[in-house]
Every structure is written in structure tokens, then in C-alpha cells.
């Protein structure tokens, strides 16, 4: 019976809708994560509205949205607070600990422990990292309100500084992180010193066995005290600077002084052009300072004065007093010249000699994300002006010594156009897609998950020899007819003569620990290939004979070899195209000016030497 045209059309429409639905379900991000150059639709990201001179806020938030380690920290920190429960972070510290805190009010301390700004920033960055189909603009008002409530003040919109806003946000995040760490430590101490809680003593050592191929394995011991190691990752913006003073006369080195930082301020020299490394040299290079009164030199001067007074002392009491003071000063010189001396009268500080000192500065703890502020302010009698020097900055920044060198990758910058008192901020952020939004191999990931195990069994599974068929004709006398087969791999080659199975062949080997741990997929795939070695040998012999005797078979073999060569060439070409596509994706940047967004390249970003104001570098992981 002939079907109606309407029925055929309905069937076709239903099949098309089903195909579209399958593509939408199983590959939702394929059009997003694939090669954007192939599509006509222009991709973009979420912009921020600017109702009242909010460009300094928008530029910093867009730059923070492009930092993967920051987003990872926010997710981990909030998830940890949810797992611990609100009761840990609602508990206030004791009076002794509260006196040492910078914040004294109980409600402020509780907000720090709860991480209010951490949660608000995560929600803000999650919204900025969406991939909209069409142009989308949101407001940062919710985050600004949370920040204003945390500081109990209003953020003015009258030409504010982006670096000041970044400093406020970063310091607040750092304070919330350290408050959460102290709250967790306080909760652990309360559990340890709880006399009413019965705890079972866990063994300090656990005996395990490592798989080394033998039957019983290799005995080993794991120390459970490794679990006590603190697994704190730290705030990604926080690093430590160490400064040390050395006297150039007596060569005494003061105790190093460590300070924490959430961003580094580098002074831009007053010249037409410079480099970022030159700005770092201004911070980390050795600085020489004159007219400094060294503590050790002051003690040496005191010994000299006391010794002269001892020579001129007339009474025994004065002589004993001076000898005791000289002894104390000598003890202080050998132990610690910086500590104050009790019971010793030193000469006036104005009489102490002035020395030349060297001040060394270095970064001892590198942050995961280093935020660099290029200070372009110049002050004179008439007022302040902007330093418009060109600062060349690299895409990969090396920091540290030769033995402990760290490499950082540029992820975002904030630029300022205008004068010192007015202008506009815009940001550049690298076009990165972080999980769970990034699925560049939607369809290949399933095929890769079905791949066989990389560790096959060392010993083949025991199986009985296959019986030969009596009706099988000989293969043109090229190889003797295989009457029986063995488990040896030699029976799979057509050139090897078959032999009767021996008792050793029929004996099944004893499986070891490692050989029994084989995935189901590898066993299943290997069983398909080794079901019948006898039939495989007969088929191989007959196929090789047919190929040798038939010219058509030889031509078809040549065609197959040519097609295999073409397949390999196409595979290598596709691999090269994927590499080029990956390089092209890494070269993409977003140029964001409030709600206006457009794409640019790395060369465009590195060319913003006159306008660059803030730089965000992320430390490179090993193997990246």
C-alpha cells in the first residue's frame, strides 16, 4: 500500500527533531568549545553595566573572573564551610584570642568566619563566566552591597582607583580565609580537650601489601600520622616578602622581617619606556642607606666608652660596676645585639656612630596569583600627574632565583586611559574555559572511556586446545594441514609448523595477584581474538595462499595499503589542525569595556604598554 505524502513528511520531521534532541542532550557545549572561527554566530561573554562611574569596579571584577585558581579557591572554601557546618563558624573566639584580633566586634568576627564576601564574589564570578548565546549585561550591584555592608560604609563613585578597590577585596578575602582557619583550629582543640568524649585510639601504623607481581605481594607499612598534615592550600593572592638589613661596617645582619602581601606595587620610573623586570628591580634590588645607627656598632662603641671609663675609674665600686656592664655587653654581642640590655647604661644614641647599611628584599613565598600594580603617580609642588611611560610586560614572567625559579602566565590586565584625575578603565582577560563549562571533546570522551586497559594480564587465561576439522582441505601444500593447535603464540603464524600439544601446554598456569586484576574490557577484547587459534592459523594460511596466487588479490592489497597510507595522512593532518586550533584558542582574549566586549589577540594585549595599570599572573603548574 502506497503511503500518503503527509505521513512520509511527518516521519521525516519526527526523525529530524529526534536527531536535534540527541545532539542537544549529548553535546550541549560542542558549538561553544569547538572552533569558533567556523561559525557565523559571534561569541561573547557577560558584560557589566556602568550606571554611575563603576568602570573601576567592572574592570577588576572582569579580570578576577578570568583567574582559574581564584575560582577554584572560592569553590573549595565555600564547600569546606558547608561540610564543617555553621556551628563551627558561628562560635566566637575567647577573650585572650579576641584581644589579639584586629576586629573586636562580635558580629564582624562572625561575618569574617562565615565568609560573606567570599560567597558574594563566587556568585558574581559564576555569573560573569557564563557563555551567553546572545549579548548579556548584568549588574554588580549585589556584590557592591555585600562589600558595603561588610565594611559598614559606602563606596564613592567619584573617580575611584581600581587598585584601591582590588586591595579592599583581596584584603577582605584574606581576612575571611584566616578567620576560617582559626575557627577550624579552635573547633579541633575543643574536640581534643573534651574529657567527656570517648575516642578510640587508631593504630599509628597500618600494614599493607604492594602488588609486585608475586602471589603474596610486597609487605609495606603506611604511617597514619600523614593524615595529620595540614592540607591548607592558602589564599591564592597571598605571598610573603622578606627584608633584611646588613651593616656595611661590621657586616652584622639583622633578623629578617617577613610581611604578607596580596598585591605588589611597583614604581614606574620617569622615563619614556621601561620594562616590567626593571620595575621589579626597583623593588627587589639592594638598597643602600646612609646615616643608620647599627645596634652592634652601638654596643661596640659602648664597650669602647666603658673601657676608657674603667681606666680612669678611681674607686673599686665604679671599677666593678663597669666590668659587670662590659661583660653584659660582650654577652649581648655574642648572642643577640638587637635585644635591649637590662642594668646597663649605654651612651646616648646621638653619640653612636652612623653607618651605611644595605637593605635586601626578596619574595620568600610566591602566591599562586600575583597581582601587580604599576604606580604611575608623580607628585610635585603643583600637584600630581600621571606617568605615561611605556612598560613592556611579557606573557610569561620568571620570578625567583636560579634554583627556585617560578614561571607565571599572564591571564588578565586592567588598563587606564586618561589623566591622573579622570579617565576610563577597561580590562583584558584570556579566553579560557574552565570546568565544568569546558568540554572540548564531547564525543571523543565516551570513546576514550571505552578503551581497553593499558595493563594486560601477564599470563594468558587457561583454555583447552581447539579440535581440528576433518573436512578442512589442505592449503595448496604451502603449509602442512593443522590437525591440532596449542596455546603457544607460534601457532597463530602460518609459517610455523603445528605440533601435538604437550602436557606442559595443557597445564593451566597459576594466576598471580597482578594477572587476576584485569579489566573486563581488555579480557573481552582479547577473548574475541583468541577463541580458536587453529581456525585463525588455517584462515591465515589460506588467505596468504590466495593472495599469492591471484593477481586481483595483489592489486586489492596494494589498494588497501594505499588507503591505509591515506588514512594515516588524514589522521596526522587532523592532529595538526587540532594543535593549530588549540594554539588559536590560547591566543584569544576578551577586551571588555563595561558592557562592550570584543575579541583580540595576545599581541594586542602586549601592545597596551602605555595604558597598563594592573597585571594578573598565574603560576604555571608542573607539566603545563
Swiss-Prot record:
Which chemical reaction does it catalyze? Thiol-dependent hydrolysis of ester, thioester, amide, peptide and isopeptide bonds formed by the C-terminal Gly of ubiquitin (a 76-residue protein attached to proteins as an intracellular targeting signal)
Q: Where is the composition biased (Polar residues)?
A: 518-544
Top-level taxon in the UniProt lineage: Eukaryota
UniProt-listed CDD domains: Peptidase_C19F (cd02662)
EC number of this enzyme:
3.4.19.12
The family database entries (SUPFAM superfamilies) matched by this protein are listed as: Cysteine proteinases (SSF54001)
Q: Where is this region: Disordered?
A: 453-573
Q: Does the keyword Protease apply?
A: yes
From the UniProt record, give one GO term of the biological process aspect. protein deubiquitination
List of catalytic residues: 55 (nucleophile), 424 (proton acceptor)
Q: Which InterPro entries match?
A: Papain-like_cys_pep_sf, Peptidase_C19, Peptidase_C19_UCH, USP_CS, USP_dom
Cellular compartments per GO CC? cytosol; nucleus
Q: Where is the composition biased (Low complexity)?
A: 479-496, 546-573
Tell me a Gene Ontology molecular-function term this record carries. cysteine-type deubiquitinase activity
USP domain: from which residue to which, for each copy? 46-620
**What's the protein name?**
Ubiquitin carboxyl-terminal hydrolase 16
Q: Which organism is it from?
A: Emericella nidulans (strain FGSC A4 / ATCC 38163 / CBS 112.46 / NRRL 194 / M139) (Aspergillus nidulans)
Q: What is the lineage of its organism?
A: Eukaryota, Fungi, Dikarya, Ascomycota, Pezizomycotina
Q: Which gene encodes it?
A: ubp16
Amino acid at each position: 500500500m502506497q503511503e500518503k505524502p503527509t505521513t512520509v513528511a511527518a516521519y521525516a520531521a519526527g526523525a529530524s527533531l529526534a536527531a536535534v534532541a540527541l545532539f542537544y542532550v549529548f553535546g550541549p557545549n560542542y558549538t561553544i568549545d569547538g572552533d569558533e572561527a567556523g561559525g557565523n554566530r559571534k561569541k561573547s561573554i557577560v558584560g557589566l553595566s556602568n550606571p554611575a562611574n563603576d568602570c573601576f569596579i567592572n574592570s577588576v571584577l572582569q579580570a578576577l573572573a578570568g583567574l582559574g585558581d581564584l575560582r577554584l579557591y572560592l569553590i573549595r572554601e565555600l564547600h569546606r564551610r558547608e561540610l564543617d557546618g555553621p556551628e563551627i563558624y558561628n562560635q566566637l573566639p575567647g577573650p585572650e584570642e579576641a584581644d589579639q584580633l584586629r576586629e573586636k566586634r562580635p558580629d564582624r568576627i562572625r561575618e569574617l568566619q562565615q565568609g560573606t564576601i567570599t560567597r558574594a564574589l563566587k556568585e558574581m564570578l559564576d555569573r560573569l563566566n557564563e557563555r551567553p548565546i546572545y549579548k548579556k549585561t548584568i549588574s554588580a550591584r549585589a556584590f557592591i552591597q555585600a562589600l558595603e555592608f561588610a565594611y559598614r560604609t559606602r563606596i564613592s563613585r567619584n573617580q575611584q582607583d581600581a587598585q584601591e578597590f582590588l586591595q579592599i577585596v583581596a584584603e577582605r578575602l584574606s581576612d575571611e580565609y584566616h578567620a576560617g582557619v582559626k575557627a577550624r583550629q579552635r573547633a579541633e582543640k575543643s574536640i581534643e580537650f573534651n574529657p567527656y568524649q570517648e575516642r578510640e585510639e587508631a593504630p599509628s601504623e597500618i600494614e599493607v601489601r604492594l602488588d609486585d607481581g608475586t602471589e603474596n605481594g610486597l609487605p609495606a607499612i603506611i604511617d597514619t600520622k600523614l593524615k595529620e598534615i595540614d592540607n591548607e592550600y592558602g589564599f591564592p593572592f597571598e605571598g610573603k616578602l622578606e627584608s633584611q638589613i646588613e651593616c656595611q661596617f661590621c657586616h652584622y645582619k639583622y633578623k629578617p622581617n617577613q610581611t604578607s602581601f596580596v598585591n605588589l606595587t611597583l614604581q614606574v620610573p620617569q622615563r619614556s619606556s621601561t620594562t616590567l623586570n626593571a620595575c621589579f628591580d626597583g623593588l627587589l634590588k639592594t638598597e643602600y642607606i646612609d646615616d643608620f645607627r647599627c645596634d652592634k656598632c652601638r654596643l661596640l662603641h659602648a664597650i669602647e666608652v666603658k673601657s676608657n671609663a674603667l681606666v680612669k675609674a678611681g674607686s673599686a665600686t665604679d671599677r666593678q660596676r663597669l666590668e659587670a656592664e662590659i661583660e653584659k655587653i660582650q654577652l649581648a654581642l655574642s648572642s643577640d645585639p638587637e635585644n635591649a640590655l637590662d642594668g646597663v647604661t649605654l651612651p646616648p644614641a646621638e653619640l653612636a656612630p652612623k653607618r651605611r647599611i644595605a637593605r635586601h628584599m626578596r619574595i620568600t613565598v610566591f602566591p599562586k596569583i600575583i597581582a601587580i600594580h604599576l604606580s604611575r603617580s608623580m607628585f610635585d609642588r603643583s600637584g600630581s600627574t600621571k606617568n605615561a611611560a611605556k612598560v613592556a610586560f611579557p606573557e610569561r614572567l620568571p620570578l625567583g632565583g636560579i634554583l627556585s625559579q617560578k614561571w607565571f602566565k599572564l591571564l588578565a590586565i586592567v588598563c587606564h586611559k586618561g589623566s591622573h584625575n579622570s579617565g576610563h578603565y577597561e580590562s583584558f582577560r584570556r579566553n579560557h574555559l574552565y570546568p565544568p563549562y569546558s568540554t572540548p571533546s564531547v564525543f571523543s570522551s565516551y570513546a576514550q572511556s571505552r578503551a581497553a586497559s593499558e595493563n594486560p594480564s601477564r599470563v594468558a587465561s587457561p583454555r583447552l586446545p581447539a579440535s581440528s576439522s576433518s573436512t578442512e582441505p589442505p592449503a595448496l601444500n604451502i603449509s602442512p594441514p593443522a590437525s591440532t593447535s596449542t596455546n603457544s603464540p607460534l601457532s597463530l603464524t602460518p609459517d610455523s609448523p603445528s605440533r601435538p600439544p604437550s602436557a606442559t601446554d595443557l597445564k593451566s598456569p597459576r594466576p598471580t595477584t597482578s594477572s587476576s586484576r584485569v579489566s573486563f574490557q581488555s579480557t573481552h577484547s582479547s577473548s574475541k581474538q583468541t577463541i580458536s587459534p587453529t581456525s585463525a592459523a588455517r584462515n591465515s594460511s589460506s588467505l596468504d595462499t590466495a593472495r599469492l596466487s591471484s593477481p586481483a588479490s595483489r592489486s586489492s592489497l596494494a589498494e588497501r595499503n594505499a588507503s591505509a597510507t591515506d588514512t594515516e595522512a588524514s589522521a596526522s593532518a587532523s592532529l595538526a589542525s587540532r594543535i593549530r586550533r588549540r594554539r588559536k584558542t590560547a591566543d584569544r582574549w576578551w577586551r571588555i569595556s563595561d558592557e562592550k566586549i570584543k575579541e583580540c589577540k595576545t599581541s594586542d594585549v602586549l601592545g597596551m604598554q602605555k595604558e597598563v595599570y594592573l597585571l594578573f599572573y598565574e603560576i604555571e603548574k608542573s607539566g603545563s
